[in-house]
Each structure stands twice: as structure tokens, then as C-alpha cells.
Curated annotation (Swiss-Prot):
InterPro entries for the chain: Chap_CCT_alpha (IPR012715), Chaperone_TCP-1 (IPR017998), Chaperonin_TCP-1_CS (IPR002194), Cpn60/GroEL/TCP-1 (IPR002423), GroEL-like_apical_dom_sf (IPR027409), GROEL-like_equatorial_sf (IPR027413), TCP-1-like_intermed_sf (IPR027410), TCP-1_chaperonin (IPR053374)
Alphabetical list of SUPFAM superfamilies matching this protein: GroEL apical domain-like, GroEL equatorial domain-like, GroEL-intermediate domain like
Record keywords: ATP-binding, Chaperone, Cytoplasm, Nucleotide-binding
Function: Molecular chaperone; assists the folding of proteins upon ATP hydrolysis. Known to play a role, in vitro, in the folding of actin and tubulin.
Taxonomy, superkingdom: Eukaryota
A GO molecular-function descriptor: unfolded protein binding
Subcellular location: Cytoplasm
Protein name: T-complex protein 1 subunit alpha
Family per similarity comment: Belongs to the TCP-1 chaperonin family.
GO CC annotation terms, alphabetical: chaperonin-containing T-complex; phagocytic vesicle
GO biological process, one term: protein folding
Length: 548
């Protein structure tokens, strides 16, 4: 039916044409990130409209920085963000896999297989794949040697800039995660990554990065006359200015007597003095604020022997308040409009100290019962430090997920190859058209080992064929069960047991990756019509056609 018959003020594309467009857009997105995949992947340089540069090979970061207009491509960008939030790593894998599934699904549609059949086949394949990972491929962490967690961190770093120093950084990551270990009210062990602050200090080499006990702030005390160390700290968290109160612009005060003018000035000073005395009387000896503190206020704090720190990040303040049992206040006024400072808003810490680290001064909040840690990264330039921060964050997320879920799988394309063989066997037992969809799903999974090999400048066909042979043997010959952990060794151009080699990933990362990629592919595959409405004409333009 044409647009004229439907009276649509816009463009309408339907059927195979819209699918072809969607697949083209999604493939274009996957092509951007696929060369950055794996331990020998390349980096991307992204320059925005104001000229700031980002150099990274993190899939989620690359896609976030690109301004994408196509709606189907946007789904893939959201997919990588979701993977980043849920797991922290595997963002490139999920995009490549979703694009491959879509490409193959589109080929099936061209061969007159109905999209509904493909969707149900993909759903079945996804369910079977996850079941197989949980029952056969996943390994409980209790059965592994003690240093397995170091290998998890190293695997996560293998594709990043810090790969050369992965031994050094994996130890820092593990130590930081161990320090923030907590047990919640249900008795579950949790590793809150928010309690780990990552600071970047320009200069020196990456290997001079350090781990500091306590939560570090990239700030200094507001005045040199203040103490640099306070033990048994009671901390006030403020999200407002501590400055002399001035009347707003545009307000008028008519004064008939000169003395009244002086009285107004005195009252302005007294208001701020009263506020500070309220804070000090509550017992606070450390004041952290996100805004400024003027000289008049500093004088009162110095006299009281208080430590005051201004211009803290709001995020940092919230985290410290949470760990110290305090509250961030946005005003001292209560519901009646009177100003007071409730002592319950104070946070308690063992010690707040200003420490010198290399060329920088830092404020460190130490608390023995509420654990926190800070990683201070050193590097040659800002671009390198930003990429190091992303790598460390991904690694922290992966280690957290592994410790909380308690199961791992071998990396290097082992899971995808095993699932490909397994799903092919399942497809052979199907008597319906779903067989085609499951078979294509199985073939799509091989894009992961293929892309790993291509990026490492190796013969992908040869390596993937060997890998498939190993996994086929593992699933048919009971004496070769250990072959199920076979993955690629990209540095030596061979297939090896990646469980023994220490190339490990959390099982949850693989499961979520397959789930998210399948769901996204299905979402885009279901679209068979695209209607783009023309933008409304602006007011005062052509008024023809109004009032129908």
C-alpha cells in the first residue's frame, strides 16, 4: 500500500528492504569494532567536534563516542553499554556476535525461511547453549588452584594497553578487590567496586602505579594553617557554598540611616559565622564540601582546629558518606526554615590525612571496619591514563563477577567452538525448518575464534578447523573429555588447553554475552516496516492543510 493511500506524511520502507538496511547498518558498526577484538586487537583514535582525543580498544567506549543516527545501529550501541554495565567486559564480543547472527538470519530470510521460524530457532539455540555452558563447560572456582583469580584479571587485561604489565596490575586489582570484600545482611559475599577509587596522576611510568588503603581524594586542605592529619575523624559532608551571604542581584534595600548599612554587613557576616559554629559545635573536625569555602570561613575553621576540604567531587563525597555512615547535606535549614546541624549526619572515620604521593597531595580517608581502597595510576600522558583506567575498571568488574558467581570457563574461543559443535548436533535431530536457524546460530558463534585469529594475522580457517576437530573429539570420545577446554593460543599459532594455560573468563560473562546478542538480533529481525515521518514545519511557516 503506498504512502498516498495511507496518507502518511513521511517515508515508508517495508519487507526485505528494511531488513537489508538494518543488517547493513549493524554490520557497519561491527566492522568498526571487530579489528579491536582480542589480545592482538588494534586501537581506535576518536576525535570529537571540539578536538578532544580518545585512544581505546574498548568496544563500549568506541561506540559511545561515535554519533550514530541509524535506529538499528543504536540498538547495538545500547547492547554494548548493557554488557559493560552488567559484566564490565565482552563488549566487543557481544556486538560482533549480534551482527553475525543478523547477517545469517537475513540470508535465511532470502532463502524463504520465515522470520518467526528463525526467531524461535535462535531462542531454542540460545537456551540450549546456556544450558550446555552451565552443565558441561563451566568449572567451579573451588576446584582450581589459588592463583586462578590472577589469571582471570590477566585475561581481561590481555587485549588492553596494560597487557605488557599485566602481572603487576593483576596483583593490584586482586588486592584492591580483596580489601573491599564485605558480607551483606543475607550472608552473601559482595565486592562493591564503588569502594575502589581510581585516580590518575600524570608522570612516571605505568609500573609506578600504587594501591593506597583508604579512599583517596584528589584534593588538598583549603588552608595551610589547618591540621594535615586528624585521628578519630568526625566528617561533615556538605553540598553547598560556605561563603559570606550576599543578597541576590536585583534586590533593593532602602536605608535611611548610615548605621543600618553597617548593621546589614555585620548580619551578613554573622549568618555565615552561625552556620560554621553549628557545624563545629556538632563535633565535626573534618569538613568536606563540593563547593567553595571563602577566606572568612577558613579563618573560623583554622581557629577551631578543623580540617576543611573544598571542591570535592560529588560522586566521591557520596561514596565516602556511605562508607562512613554520614549524610550529604544540601542545606542546614530544616522544614521550619531554621538552621541546625544534626549530629547523625556526621560520618566517622579512623583517620583523615593529607599525604604526598609523588608530585601530588591527596586526602585519604581511612576506615578499618568499612573497607575501601584507591588505585593511583601513573602514566606518560592523559590518553594512556584514560585507557589504563578503563582497563583497570573492566578487570575489577570481571574479577568481582567471577568471585560472586563462582564459575569460570576457558577463553580463546573455546566456549564458542564447543557450542558450535553441540548446536550443530542438536540441529541434526530437528525435523523442522528450525534446523536451519539453529545450524546458522552454531555457525555464527565461530565468528569469535575466527576474528581472534584474523586480528592476530594467523590463518583463521586452519586454526578454527583444528579447534572444531578438538571439540568434536571431546563431545564424541569420552577419553578426550579434557579437549572441551581447548582454545586458541594466538602467540604460538596453535590450539591448547586454555584451562591449564590460565586463559579464563567468568561463565556469567559468556552467558550474558550470548543472551544479549541473541535478544538484540531477534529485536532487529522482528522489524519488517520502517516509517520515518517528515519533521513538522515550524510555526509561522506554510499554513496550508491545517484545520482538516
Amino acid at each position: 500500500m503506498s504512502n498516498k493511500v495511507l496518507m502518511i506524511d513521511g517515508d515508508r520502507i517495508s519487507g526485505n528492504e528494511v531488513r537489508a538496511q538494518n543488517v547493513l547498518a549493524v554490520t557497519a558498526i561491527a566492522n568498526i569494532v571487530k579489528t579491536s577484538f582480542g589480545p592482538i586487537g588494534l586501537d581506535k583514535m576518536l576525535i570529537d567536534n571540539i578536538g578532544s582525543i580518545v585512544v581505546t580498544n574498548d568496544g563500549a567506549t568506541i561506540l559511545q563516542k561515535i554519533d550514530i543516527e541509524h535506529p538499528a545501529a543504536k540498538i547495538l550501541v545500547q547492547l554494548s553499554e548493557l554488557q559493560d554495565q552488567e559484566v564490565g567486559d565482552g563488549t566487543t564480543t557481544v556486538v560482533i556476535l549480534a551482527a553475525e547472527l543478523l547477517k545469517r538470519a537475513n540470508e535465511l530470510v532470502a532463502r524463504k525461511v520465515h522470520p518467526t521460524v528463525i526467531i524461535s530457532g535462535f531462542r531454542l539455540a540460545c537456551t540450549e547453549a546456556i544450558k550446555y555452558i552451565n552443565e558441561t563447560l563451566a568449572v567451579k572456582v573451588e576446584t582450581l588452584p589459588k592463583d586462578f583469580i590472577v589469571n582471570i584479571a590477566k585475561t581481561s587485561m590481555s587485549s588492553k594497553t596494560i597487557n605488557d604489565d599485566s602481572d603487576f596490575f593483576s596483583k593490584i586489582v586482586i588486592e584492591a578487590i580483596t580489601r573491599v570484600k564485605t558480607i551483606d545482611y543475607k550472608g552473601d559475599v559482595k565486592y562493591p567496586i564503588n569502594a575502589i577509587n581510581i585516580l590518575k596522576a600524570h608522570g612516571k611510568s605505568a609500573k609506578e602505579s600504587t594501591l593506597v588503603e583508604g579512599y583517596a581524594l584528589n584534593c588538598t586542605v583549603a588552608s595551610e594553617g589547618m591540621p594535615k592529619r586528624i585521628q578519630g575523624a568526625k566528617i561533615a559532608f556538605l553540598d553547598f557554598n560556605l561563603a559570606k551571604t550576599k543578597m541576590k542581584l536585583g534586590q533593593k534595600v532602602v536605608v535611611t540611616n548610615v548605621n543600618d548599612l553597617e548593621a546589614i554587613r555585620d548580619r551578613e557576616n554573622d549568618i555565615v559565622k552561625e552556620r560554621i559554629s553549628l557545624i563545629i559545635k556538632s563535633g565535626a573536625n573534618v569538613v568536606l564540601t563540593t563547593k567553595g569555602i571563602d577566606d572568612l570561613c577558613l579563618k573560623y575553621f583554622v581557629e577551631a582546629g578543623c580540617m576543611a576540604v573544598r571542591r570535592c567531587k560529588k560522586e566521591d563525597l557520596k561514596r565516602i558518606a556511605k562508607s562512613c555512615g554520614g549524610t550529604v547535606l544540601i542545606t542546614l535549614a530544616n522544614l521550619e526554615g531554621e538552621e541546625s546541624f544534626d549530629t547523625t549526619a556526621l560520618g566517622i572515620a579512623d583517620e583523615v590525612v593529607q599525604d604526598r604521593l609523588a608530585d601530588d597531595e591527596l586526602i585519604i580517608v581511612k576506615n578499618s571496619n568499612k573497607k575501601s581502597a584507591s588505585i593511583i595510576l601513573r602514566g606518560a600522558n592523559e590518553l594512556m591514563l584514560d585507557e589504563m583506567e578503563r582497563s583497570i575498571h573492566d578487570s575489577l568488574c570481571i574479577v568481582k563477577r567471577t568471585l560472586e558467581s563462582g564459575t569460570i570457563v576457558p577463553g580463546g574461543g573455546a566456549v564458542e567452538s564447543a557450542l558450535s559443535i553441540y548446536l550443530d548436533n542438536i540441529a541434526a535431530t530437528m525435523g523442522s525448518r528450525k534446523q536451519l536457524a539453529i545450524s546458522e546460530f552454531a555457525e555464527s558463534l565461530l565468528v569469535v575464534p575466527k576474528q581472534l585469529a584474523v586480528n592476530a594475522a594467523l590463518d583463521a580457517s586452519d586454526l578454527v578447523s583444528k579447534l572444531k576437530a578438538y571439540h568434536h573429539a571431546a563431545q564424541t570420545d569420552p577419553s578426550k573429555k579434557s579437549y572441551a577446554y581447548s582454545g586458541l593460543d594466538l602467540f604460538n599459532n596453535k590450539v591448547r588447553n586454555n584451562l591449564e594455560a590460565g586463559v579464563l573468563e567468568p561463565a556469567i560473562a559468556k552467558i550474558k554475552c550470548i543472551k544479549f546478542a541473541t535478544e538484540s538480533a531477534i529485536t532487529i529481525l522482528r522489524i519488517d516496516d520502517k516509517i520515518t515521518l517528515n519533521p513538522r514545519e515550524q510555526q509561522g511557516g506554510d499554513h496550508e492543510g491545517h484545520g482538516h
